[in-house]
Curated annotation (Swiss-Prot):
Record's keyword terms, sorted: Membrane, Transmembrane, Transmembrane helix, Transport, Vacuole
This protein's name: Protein DETOXIFICATION 40
Coiled coil, from the record: none
Similarity comment text for this entry: Belongs to the multi antimicrobial extrusion (MATE) (TC 2.A.66.1) family.
Any one GO molecular function term: antiporter activity
Location in the cell: Vacuole membrane
InterPro entries found in the cross-reference section: MATE_euk, MATE_fam
Entry's transmembrane regions: 55-75, 89-109, 143-163, 167-187, 201-221, 227-247, 285-305, 316-336, 356-376, 401-421, 433-453, 458-478
Any Gene Ontology CC annotation: plant-type vacuole
Organism per entry: Arabidopsis thaliana (Mouse-ear cress)
BP GO annotations: xenobiotic detoxification by transmembrane export across the plasma membrane
Topology in membrane: Multi-pass membrane protein
Amino acid sequence: MDSSPNDGVHQPLLHPQPSPSPPESTNGELETVLSDVETPLFLRLRKATIIESKLLFNLAAPAVIVYMINYLMSMSTQIFSGHLGNLELAAASLGNTGIQVFAYGLMLGMGSAVETLCGQAYGGRKYEMLGVYLQRSTVLLTLTGLLLTLIYVFSEPILLFLGESPAIASAASLFVYGLIPQIFAYAANFPIQKFLQSQSIVAPSAYISTATLFVHLLLSWLAVYKLGMGLLGASLVLSLSWWIIVVAQFVYIVTSERCRETWRGFSVQAFSGLWSFFKLSAASAVMLCLETWYFQILVLLAGLLENPELALDSLSICMTISGWVFMISVGFNAAISVRVSNELGAGNPKSAAFSVIIVNIYSLITCVILAIVILACRDVLSYAFTEGKEVSDAVSDLCPLLAVTLVLNGIQPVLSGVAVGCGWQTFVAKVNVGCYYIIGIPLGALFGFYFNFGAKGIWTGMIGGTVIQTFILAWVTFRTDWTKEVEEASKRLDKWSNKKQEVVPE
């Protein structure tokens, strides 16, 4: 049921409510082309590919820029820290990959509930609900951030308990203390990001992130080298940079004409139905966390090897490069989530299915090219992070595994994006548990420790889990009944926009 201004469901505190206009990406043009059986198949596919490519790249290109620049901020912080010494590099790597990614995965995962609901609500033209979903998610993520703060505060004893060396654990905890403000930036940023993406508004975030990157680099240089603030200064600057992005994006939302229909001002509805929203957010969080924590465990296991500093340095450099390239796939992930959820919400099953095919092709080709580049530059990659010859040789030795990971990243994140667009988070979470934690991690530990293959063995085993997970998601996506998914999306929208559901939590 659509909510109206006076139905008691949504009582805005700011701004009048204008009449909505149909979203450009779901105007039915692509569905019409794909359904035109009188046109030869080749001509239909060519025209549909042109339409979808335009829609996709209008979403994906700015989204890739946003994710890559956000990741570059963390990557540059690690580079600044690494040039202080090998211990500082290991500490920043462990703090970033071992602690920060824990929070990042949880908060981004919970924010993905907004991606499903806002995307389908926008496609179904239930615009007034988007602002409510944004605010409700921010409330939930802020409460979650309070709990995560405890992990940051007690990061040193946690790392020691996990078997990390005292020197690295102590330095990493200092780095992590400066990242505490970043937790609450995540709580605001991820819902805002998904709110904008669901409306195909991505370019402003790209501009904001690009400008913030230059500010971040300047402030990092001042804090680390000129003011001598070391690891703590580097992480505090990273937190500040994330808050700059949050504030700038929110100012855009409340002042932009493009968000006039979806942002109706602050609403008390943000505090109702929290338990029902939490259950959906938790399913999204579990799905994504099981993925992000998987490679976090890879780095933690490397810290238990015979030469932990070398293993951490070499593996974390590879993971940083992988993560940077992964941001391209995450951009495609965001694009396909929006495309699928919008088309399902608008009742266009053929368009949703066609979008999945096109984005997988583009993402895979991009990542294969980058994997080839990585292999060609394997002997010089590490010198951007550290000057050590020993670390450089270790990184070069791991590059073939890095290339395989990049190719898998051309498919797997996109399939996860399809899952978010369709609302399959619970199913994917179960697949991730089986493939990652029942198969991948035990295999990695077996190869790395029992057979003494070290970091290469750990990584090889865990790649095996990723391969199985990718095949399962590809098979399920291939067999999807998209007409049925349209019906499920309609039911989901009716549930979440129903007046009684909004007022009374389940």
